[in-house]
Amino acid sequence: LVGSEMCIRDRLTVEQKDAIIAACGEIIDGKHHDQFPVDMIQGGAGTTTNMNANEVIANRALELMGHERGEYQYCSPNDHVNCSQSTNDAYPTAIHIGMYFKHLQLLPHLEELIASFRKKGEEFSRIIKMGRTQLEDAVPMTLGQTFNGFASILQDEIAHLNEAAVDFLVVNMGATAIGTGICAEPGYAEKCIAALREITGWNIRLSSDLVGATSDTSCLVGYASAMKRVCVKMNKICNDLRLLASGPRCGLGEFNLPAMQPGSSIMPGKVNPVIPEVMNQIAYKVMGNELCVTMAGEAAQMELNAMEPVMAQCCFESVDLLINGFDTLRIRCVDGIVANEDRCREEVHHSIGVVTALNPVIGYKNSTKIAKEALETGVSVYQLVLDHGILTKEELDTILSPENMIK
């Protein structure tokens, strides 16, 4: 619309302008989408996609003007539809706007997953279990603290995603071929930014250096990296879910994951943690996409990065994967987790890790002796302290109460 209005005085007729605007409106309304067959991964820095759009718009405009498709002397995809713009500003600007929109779509799904973990944290807040470091018994904690921990580490990532997404609001529209603005009408860039702000309601800004912005794709690198950060934490969480739910008889078995399907074609009754496994694999894919984005991002040469199409494809795909993954993990796993409270308390009762609470009272050396003897004999720490007359039963009950050891 801005291009049409600014070019009308000597490069477009009113009839051409109105037809182009009408054709664009139809595409926005969902029509003619079958006329966009090109793959997102393409050579030419997005020229294929840009000209696909220009040609569809031009041909539809021709029909609205009463002409045949291809009669470009009446409405040209290059001279008229592409007036005042280039692939090298229109394409990346569209990517920026699309990615910011996808970012806004992603956040609620992550927030809902975080809320689900918080809900389980509250539900399990009074269930005592054993904490572990390096897979070895450490000190008691609550199962609720485990799930609140999951929620907290994911909550931190929302700020990182928001910070990375802000860069999408800086665009190079009006830069045309390499950032010099050649072939664009005077004032075109500023009017475009004003129109984009009005249409989106976002604080879209024109880059302060259009030459630099035209070759720079670091906003995609940054957002792909932010998504990778989320996936690193999602992998830790899903690995913990699988390990803590292992069993049912010979594993940790602190809680049960909802059963989704028979786990084996040969072992009756086996149930696998398929939903955390799905999220793990989604995370691997998103992390792989981030590597692709990084490699393509460093491929910029001179005044343009011809590899931006695959960067965009990876980022859009990663957002969609995460949205589906977050929802699947929340609905089909986290919401249905059931704690095995007796099993959790049994672990604490038989653990040697509770001896850590004795350090301030009997010292590290004596505590170590008790721990070693408990490990060698199978006798509980509680009983050994009583047998050696180190503390009274009343003193022990106070010190070794799991509830008192949880801060």
Predicted regions and their residues:
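Extended amphipathic alpha-helical scaffolds
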Residues: 28-45, 162-175, 398-400
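Internal glycine-rich alpha/beta core junctions
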Residues: 48-87, 105-121, 139-293
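Short, small-residue-biased leader/transition segments that mark boundaries at the very start
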Residues: 1-8
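Mobile "lid/hinge" segments at catalytic clefts and subdomain interfaces of large enzymes
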Residues: 71-102, 106-123, 318, 325-342, ...
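Alpha/propeptide regions of enzymes that mature by internal proteolysis
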Residues: 11-19
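Catalytic-core signal marking the mid-to-C-terminal active-site face
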Residues: 157, 208, 212-216, 220, ...
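Internal maturation/activation junctions in enzymes
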Residues: 17, 23-26
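Intrinsically disordered, low-complexity linker/loop segments enriched in Gly/Pro
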Residues: 121, 127-130
